């Protein structure tokens, strides 16, 4: 039995899952392949895209999704994670969890007898990265040979993109202020994968260096859930990294803009960019549904 806790868990299947997602989007798959299957969805953090896309995805696949807020579960009152995992495994065919701590998801998967899918942790967001690659493929025609630059905080989304880019044939750079680099272990793993696939990973505080020959400019909020106490300092540190028309001009002609949403216009991105012709953020949001249907099919079928 396999789980999706990290991009590394699907490093040999990424392209197959993306092909599945494309087929689901184009209506080429069998109808209701997960009829009679159920998915428990545990949420420790609030969500719009993750909750709706998994819920609708299971419905469209013929199965049922059960929304479980951690505050409503005994887990929220101190029941050990292993006990929760063992009990849920007796009732459902899979567990999706959106958690605060990555270690909690690892522990849940360790004791679960059914596949566990990460809907986001403080370390990674693999389903988002799959949706992102599907979106890039649609808009640029291919992934191989393209380059993505993540601008801003080296967060969970950035971590998953770093791991996935070389697997699909892309180079990747990260433009961030010093002190906000992505997780060191993730960067080392990404560089190892890049070496294996003859690709490049670059981390730089210099925008011109990071945005050289870039086809995709990607950003995310400067203040993630849990970082609110640092908000004022973060806004100062990230101000030069706002994705606006000047920054976009450093990328290639025809470059697209991406953001996993929710976005704060006037902070990490200007309104003219996110609402402009280069922005593909709502296609990207929609593709969460198709990518996750592929994930559910892959792990629960």
Swiss-Prot record:
Pfam families noted in UniProt: OTCace (PF00185), OTCace_N (PF02729)
The question of whether Amino-acid biosynthesis is a record keyword is answered with yes
- Where is this protein found? Cytoplasm
One GO cellular component term of this record is: cytoplasm
Listed under GO biological process in this entry are: arginine biosynthetic process via ornithine; citrulline biosynthetic process; L-arginine biosynthetic process
Leading EC class: transferase
UniProt-annotated binding residues for L-ornithine:
156, 220, 224-225
Write out the residues that bind carbamoyl phosphate.
47-50, 74, 98, 125-128, 260-261, 288
Among PROSITE patterns, the record links this protein to:
CARBAMOYLTRANSFERASE
Q: Major place of localization?
A: cytoplasm
Molecular function, one GO term: ornithine carbamoyltransferase activity
EC number(s) for this protein? 2.1.3.3
Identify the pathway: Amino-acid biosynthesis; L-arginine biosynthesis; L-arginine from L-ornithine and carbamoyl phosphate: step 1/3
The protein's annotated catalytic reaction(s) are: carbamoyl phosphate + L-ornithine = L-citrulline + phosphate + H(+)
The record's listing under InterPro entries reads: Asp/Orn_carbamoyltranf_P-bd, Asp/Orn_carbamoylTrfase, Asp/Orn_carbamoylTrfase_sf, Asp_carbamoyltransf_Asp/Orn-bd, Orn/put_carbamltrans, OTCase_ArgI
What PANTHER family does the record tag this protein with? ORNITHINE CARBAMOYLTRANSFERASE, MITOCHONDRIAL (PTHR45753), ORNITHINE TRANSCARBAMYLASE, MITOCHONDRIAL (PTHR45753:SF3)
What HAMAP family does its record include?
Answer: OTCase
The UniProt entry's sequence similarity note says: Belongs to the aspartate/ornithine carbamoyltransferase superfamily. OTCase family.
* NCBIfam families assigned: orni_carb_tr, PRK00779.1
Q: What does this protein do?
A: Reversibly catalyzes the transfer of the carbamoyl group from carbamoyl phosphate (CP) to the N(epsilon) atom of ornithine (ORN) to produce L-citrulline.
Q: What is this protein called?
A: Ornithine carbamoyltransferase
Q: What is the lineage of its organism?
A: Archaea, Methanobacteriati, Methanobacteriota, Methanomada group, Methanobacteria
* Originating gene: argF
């Amino acid at each position: 039995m396999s789980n999706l806790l990290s991009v590394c868990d699907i490093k040999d299947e990424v392209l197959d899952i993306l092909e599945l997602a494309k087929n689901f989007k184009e209506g080429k798959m069998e109808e209701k392949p997960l009829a009679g299957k159920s998915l428990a969805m545990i949420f420790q953090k609030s969500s719009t895209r993750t909750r709706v896309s998994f819920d609708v995805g299971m419905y469209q696949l013929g199965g049922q999704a059960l929304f479980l807020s951690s505050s409503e579960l005994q887990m929220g009152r101190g029941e050990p994670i292993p006990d929760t995992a063992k009990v849920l495994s007796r009732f459902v065919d899979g567990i999706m969890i959106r958690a605060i701590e990555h270690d909690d998801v690892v522990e849940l998967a360790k004791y679960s007898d059914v596949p566990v899918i990460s809907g986001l942790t403080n370390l990674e967001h693999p389903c988002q990265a799959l949706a992102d690659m599907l979106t890039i493929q649609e808009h640029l025609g291919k992934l191989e040979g393209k380059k993505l630059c993540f601008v801003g905080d080296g967060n969970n989304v950035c971590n998953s993109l770093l791991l996935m880019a070389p697997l699909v044939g892309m180079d990747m750079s990260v433009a961030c202020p010093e002190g906000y680099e992505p997780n060191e272990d993730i960067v080392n793993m990404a560089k190892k994968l890049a070496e294996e696939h003859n690709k490049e990973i670059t981390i730089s505080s210099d925008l011109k260096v990071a945005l050289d020959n870039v086809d995709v400019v990607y950003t995310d909020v400067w203040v993630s859930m849990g970082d609110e106490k640092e908000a004022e300092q973060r806004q100062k540190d990230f101000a030069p990294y706002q994705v606006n028309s000047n920054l976009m001009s450093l990328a290639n002609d025809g470059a697209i803009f991406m953001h996993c949403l929710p976005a704060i216009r006037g902070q990490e991105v200007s309104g003219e960019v996110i609402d402009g012709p280069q922005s593909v953020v709502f296609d990207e949001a929609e593709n969460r549904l198709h990518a996750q249907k592929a994930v559910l099919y892959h792990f629960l079928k």
